[in-house]
Amino acid sequence: MAERFDRIWHNARLATMRADRPDLGEIEHGLIAARGGHIVYAGAAADFPADADAIKRIDCAGRWITPGLVDCHTHLVYGGNRAHEFELRLKGASYEEIARAGGGIVSTVAATRKASEAELVASALPRLDALIGEGATTVEIKSGYGLDAETEMRQLAAARSLGRQRPVAIRTSFLGAHALPPEADGDKDRYIDLVCKEMLPAVAKAGLADAVDTFMEGIAFSAGQTARVFETARGLGLPVKLHADQLSNLGGAALAAKFSALSADHLEHTDEAGAAAMAKAGTVAVLLPGAFYFIRETQKPPVESFRKHGVHMALASDCNPGSSPLTSLLLAMNMGATLFRMTVAECLAGVTREGAHALGVLDETGTLEAGKWCDLAIWDIERPAELVYRIGFNPLHRRVWRGQ
């Protein structure tokens, strides 16, 4: 009796992105079969049973299929609008001047605290829709603009709600240690006490976070303060991530590695020792060219060092109101190639396989292979390099999430 599937996509070219295959894992004459939302077969059409049946067969007319895209670092949920600050900066105002005038992250925190969960969801939906419209099937969303227990949890609840309102997998990260709230009066240690003793336990009890993130930087939190957050997270059974070495080298990459972090992100100032430590720990480097571009950074992340040591590299939008108002993984790939000199294969892996790796969900998505969710992006392109090469162009033909 012939095997029956829910859907079969045939007459397709596949970029499987499997790590055990060279380059993009291309299959020129490929086919994908799915059942129950999962891939059952992804491979050469010639090796697939000719008598296989399906409820629906889709002729892809020679189009390319990649895994659905993964944006592994975003701050999609927030209140307010900081476009006016962009205008001020173009007129010569510094970050410090804007902050003293009540702008910067303080303004986003104030607006986020005032917003209801429904308002946060409504403002984030267009940003999420933009990512979905370019083939994203998994999106990570951080808190970090509440800086008090109530608002941080409201941000995370809003992120979870987005996943119920759209066909997309949402992964949430608690980023309570993002900045110091105004009411802390400059006392970082006291605020970290609040994060570790009140916020994190409440977030964990509510099941609102898949991971815990921290911003370790001179303008944010120290290595010791970060370690306290990570130790608390570990005690609660939550994996960790780190905003590391963006503006200076405080040893963030090495600290992330010490705690076996899923990822260390930004990394413009990471040194050789940090890269080696990340490789040994299996911590993914998440590169964020949108922020590099938007704040006109000049120090590039050490891509050659990451290659040398075998550090896995992901790319993400870092969508946020202050330093990367970017909602395009296609543009993030072009920036990764143009600004960081990443290869086409590295860029495509960065928003598929390695993005999933950075979220700890590589066993579920990120490549085209049997057993994973049937998350696909089908493209009107002649070759996969076009996804990285072209600017301001969206060749997505169809997006498939969990087989639908």
From Swiss-Prot:
Protein biosynthesis among keywords: no
Query: Kind of enzyme, top EC level?
Result: hydrolase
The residues that the entry says bind Fe(3+) are 73, 75, 243, 318
Name the cystine pairs: none
The protein here is known as: Imidazolonepropionase
Cofactor remark from the record? Binds 1 zinc or iron ion per subunit.
Against InterPro entries, the record matches this protein to:
Amidohydro_3, HutI, Metal-dep_hydrolase_composite, Metal_Hydrolase
Cofactor dependency = Zn(2+); Fe(3+)
Which organism does this sequence originate in? Answer: Bradyrhizobium diazoefficiens (strain JCM 10833 / BCRC 13528 / IAM 13628 / NBRC 14792 / USDA 110)
Gene encoding it?
A: hutI
What family does this belong to? Belongs to the metallo-dependent hydrolases superfamily. HutI family.
Q: Which residues bind N-formimidoyl-L-glutamate?
A: 145, 320, 322
